[in-house]
């Protein structure tokens, strides 16, 4: 919830979460009385009278089948009062809101003839040609100026407007679907509705965007309405309105492609939210190579070497080839980022939003138009240079960045040499741009608009007065549209699991956790509603998340559940017989009932690793034995040996390890042999292995620790102290050695090292 309405938090909680009309009435009356606000008294009295009448009927013993429905109607009426009160607080406390309210005070959306105003503008522009030539330009500038002012004021009026009613919704829908109105104006007004709907839910705004999305034949209008409508799915208060949920379901039924677009939009929002991180990556890992290898020109068709007559070119041709290769790799990395949806230009343009044009909030969402009155001075200064035409056709930049570029270029135009001005006239001036041949598709249009929105929510001076719909690390679960209360796991399982797979692939652990925490498995989902493949994927993703969080016992349970499902599916068993535990969300089944020999290798290896990490060496041994028989993989044999050491079968482990050591010169094999020998109490041989590891390039921290054990057991205490100190220098915590000794207590005790010896050694090392 926006911090500007925090004073109303109790009221909203009463209404939305607790559905407590009595408490909500009391709290909002107290709140309004404290602030001296009286113009909601009539609306409050209507709700209170209705509630008192309901109580009176109930006390007399009347049964009313409509009681629950009427109760929720009153809750919604009270919600609109709280909504409007929050707008008042924003106007009282927000710099933009207060200015916008003052500027638009003469506009009442209930009474404003919006369509007529815009149609009048079109007619006035058409009539200019009938005027004398000498006065046409002046008249045109006057009409355009008045129209732009009205558009800006109307934009502000929409943003600060209170809760809408059906009349406003119908009027706005008719305006936004009016084919005679300039599309640029329609797009601007749609952004105003979106901006006014980022915190609290307004059913009539939601319905307006829905009707425009489904009713418009213009893809730009359709997508801008769709983005605003989808963002509203996460706004506070939406759960009060069953009509909104029905509308969402109807939209999916009416448009078979809408579900795909909804999921695609979710991914685009995620990529767009990464713009700052992507910019940091470009600055650190890509731009240095591009700048170092500056003797090349980047064009749309690729990277070309510039002409240079220096003798050094012939002498150092190999170096040039390497530079060319490095530059191509860096350039291609950046282009690949853009193709997958990354906002690669955010960093460059983030410093170019201080021009007067951006002082008006509505201009942040204005479609780029060469004939815009804001570009009149730009065109005059450019003269015959066709930069604006190239900029308009460019498919790389969002509209906001195109305006930034236009204003920035004229500020340095006088410093640009003539030959560079000629290049600016070429169609290839924006050759670095990714040539998106699908620039009129819904995907491209949405991405460009999302970038406009992202720049506003990240860079605008008044951004703190709005609740950004973009994802922040600490608020992942609040910004994911698929986590809306309107989304059910049963209905959206493919999309939810696809996003979860995406999260795992890109190691977005917070997002994966948010998804799996929100969409919990139930008895009905496991035994009936979800298909086998969806269930198995859920458990696989759950296991991966738990492994990442070092919750190895729970990961074992997740992978075991997957294996049980695999067996059940293969044998055609009735899923209703599964013993699902709703508290843990796992399927309870004894390990002995699982047929490991028939299990898929990819699943069994995950289960085996979880068992090994959890310390269940007996289970890990069994799994790796079967995996080694299925696949003669090096890693399976190595982990099998580790598990055997864990169960005390060191000789069998060494047999495997010595064979691996002959086949592969691998440090991890030698490290495991050293550990096995230490466990076996063959301390001298173990010491020799650790001594070699410490002198190698493949040393790891625990080599020092285990070498220290060998030295200590062999009574080489001064060398042991050095090894432990080296290990401590890497661990950098005073308790590390104590924890290590406790963990390896059995090995040390078996070698005759007592608890007192351990305490003394810790003190010596820490001196």
Residue ranges and their predicted role:
Residues 365-577, 588-596, 606:
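Alpha-solenoid helical-repeat scaffolds
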Residues 10, 30, 46-49, 188-192, ...:
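"A position-specific structural signal for the A-helix of alpha-solenoid helical repeats
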Residues 33, 230-254, 559-567, 709-735, ...:
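TPR/TPR-like (Sel1-like) alpha-helical repeat modules
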Residues 37-41, 217-226, 238-241, 252-265, ...:
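Boundary/linker segments of alpha-helical solenoid repeat arrays
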